[in-house]
Amino acid sequence: MLEEAYLDLAKTVLTTGHEKTDRTGTGTISLFGYQMRFNLQEGFPLLTTKKVPFGLIKSELLWFLRGDTNIRFLLQHHNHIWDEWAFQRYVDSPEYHGPDMTDFGRRSLVDADFNQRYQAEKKAFCDRIVTDQAFGDHFGDLGLVYGSQWRAWQGHQGETIDQLANVIETLRTHPDSRRMIVSAWNPADVPSMALPPCHTLFQFYVNDGKLSCQLYQRSADIFLGVPFNIASYALLTSLIAKEVGLEVGDFVHTLGDAHIYSNHVEQIKTQLARTPHAAPQLWLNPDKSSIFDYEMSDIKVTGYDPEPAIKAPVAV
């Protein structure tokens, strides 16, 4: 099964990982240095041992591809996975005059009354991002995060570098190049980012008419984040392969700090007790030629028959 690589990762970290503290204060079981490989010829690696919301993966990747850094696009597509980081910037600003939201990530998990206030404040914030242009332009922006680095890296001479477009052109003209790399980790810009990039750098490789991609991910939330990352980069590889006339090869996922949060352990044990199903297939609109032209309706998975979703809190 295509999914076994992920399940093996989870088992390995549970059994051999080290207990560590972390930035969020949640605590983790962590392992440093791990690699998974997914043969994309065998299907699309969207996990089946729990339902993974593919619509959120699609809209986030399209957001990256647009070079966008404002959550308004995500909210318009009912995607809330970046809300907490934008909201954090707002409540830390002098413009916020609502209830005390200090340490809202942890307090919302242990205090039901606070969680009710927090959810109401966050919903009002997200609604205003969409409806109030000036407010949304300011507080919806996450800084120079993924989309900006992929599509508009700022060079030393003030030039703008579209790393992704450059890689696609190199795939067409010099497919054996070892320089087909896109980096989201820009040390000069990290302080301005709401969340420094977890998936930091990816590289493409062509062999026998197939396109493979390797991702280096510095920080890997195994239960919540990694399933998204696997599917997102498999989708990106598939989109680019289609554009340049190649078949898909492997997605290689290299992890730095691979961790399971302490409040995800029971959930991941539940997932590991389940039996994987057959991998779904990816459908891409044959009428689209550029990865920058896709809309939500142009990307679908077929034959997806997952086990039920398993909820878990996000560590902010």
UniProtKB/Swiss-Prot annotation:
CDD domains on file: TS_Pyrimidine_HMase (cd00351)
Active-site residues (renumbered): C198
Enzyme class at the top of the EC tree: transferase
Cross-referenced Pfam families: Thymidylat_synt
Keywords: Cytoplasm, Methyltransferase, Nucleotide biosynthesis, Transferase
GO molecular function, one term: thymidylate synthase activity
Pathway named in the protein's UniProt entry: Pyrimidine metabolism; dTTP biosynthesis
Gene3D superfamilies: Thymidylate synthase/dCMP hydroxymethylase domain (3.30.572.10)
EC number(s) recorded for this UniProt protein: 2.1.1.45
SUPFAM superfamilies to which the protein is assigned, alphabetical: Thymidylate synthase/dCMP hydroxymethylase
Residues given in the record as (6R)-5,10-methylene-5,6,7,8-tetrahydrofolate binding sites: D221, A315
Reaction(s) this enzyme catalyzes, per UniProt: dUMP + (6R)-5,10-methylene-5,6,7,8-tetrahydrofolate = 7,8-dihydrofolate + dTMP
PROSITE patterns from the UniProt entry: THYMIDYLATE_SYNTHASE
NCBIfam families linked to this entry: PRK01827.1-2, thym_sym
Protein family: Belongs to the thymidylate synthase family. Bacterial-type ThyA subfamily.
Subunit structure: Homodimer.
Record's protein name: Thymidylate synthase
Organism: Levilactobacillus brevis (strain ATCC 367 / BCRC 12310 / CIP 105137 / JCM 1170 / LMG 11437 / NCIMB 947 / NCTC 947)
Gene: thyA
